[in-house]
Amino acid sequence: MFIFPYKNASASAKALGLGIGAKRIKTANSRFKGSPDKVVINWGSSELPEEVMKCKVINPPAITNVASNKLKFFKAIQRFNNHTEDGDYVQIPDFTSDPDRAEYWVHSGSIVVARHKLTGNSGEGIELMEGEFDDEAPVAPLYVKYVPKKQEYRVHVANGKVVDLQRKARRHDIADEDINWRIRNHDNGFIFARNDLHVPQSVSRQAILACKAIGLDFGAVDIIYNKRQETAYVLEINTAPGLTGQTLEGYVERFKNWDEVIEEQPVALAALRIDMEAMARGRVATPQPVRVEGWDVVE
């Protein structure tokens, strides 16, 4: 087994490689030679060299591309929801690319998150629209209706199983006035924690279903939970998450046994991936109705 990191300096890719005994492939000037009998873990890259593409790839790059782009991701989930037959939907917030609709939401009393950067992380490129909003909506490729949340989680999923679960918790070294409860990231006073984990079952279920919906083999799913609605909402999936401690151990355990299951990838899951890859290239394929049973996606 090999690992292709999105950048050579990825500490998590290095740690995972050491844990499972996998060699890392250089992102440039590599002498790696691919073949169908080799397995490569794609660690967050939306493009892979020709030699790597000759191998069995865990998290194909076209699907990683969809996951890394917030608008593509929401559209992919929306299309999955529109064509699933068993009513098992991935819950996502309302979204639009239409600034007029975003303005309407604000004037109707909602808070809207304008996303200026589709591939940003840690709150990068976010602008909140709320209250007495008299100006025109800022020009942005994506607007998402804000959902109030009781908790925010990161659920690590690998091969259809939750390998670790973290909660975003307040840092106590940050003053009250510097805490931003709406955008919970490190700069706004939050860290990942495992204490006081009382996680609704729907959180894990939504994380697993979101990965299945776009054909990801693994990913760290960011989810918020609205207690009043008793609903978990999927926000995004990270395909190159930070790995330390218990999180790293969970991934190592799953990847050590991975080659036993990739031989039996369901035909319909492969078809779903082709659909997602078409979306990544900007071509809209005609999706086939699917239903989800366990890890398998079957016609």
What are the functions of these language-model segments?
Residues 157-159, 223-227:
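Short, low-complexity Ser/Thr-rich regulatory SLiMs
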Residues 112, 161-164, 219, 233-236:
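Protein kinase-like catalytic core scaffold
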Residues 111-113, 141-143, 218-221:
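A short linear hydrophobic-aromatic micro-motif
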Residues 117-202:
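Phosphate-binding site of ATP-dependent enzymes
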Residues 2-108:
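Conserved N-proximal alpha/beta basic substrate-recognition cap immediately N-terminal to
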Residues 212-216, 225-299:
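C-terminal active-site "lid" helix and adjoining low-complexity regulatory extension at the edge
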Residues 203-212:
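A short, acidic, amphipathic alpha-helical segment used as a generic capping/interface helix at domain edges
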Residues 45-47, 117-119, 240:
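Short glycine-rich anion-binding loops that position phosphate/pyrophosphate groups of nucleotides
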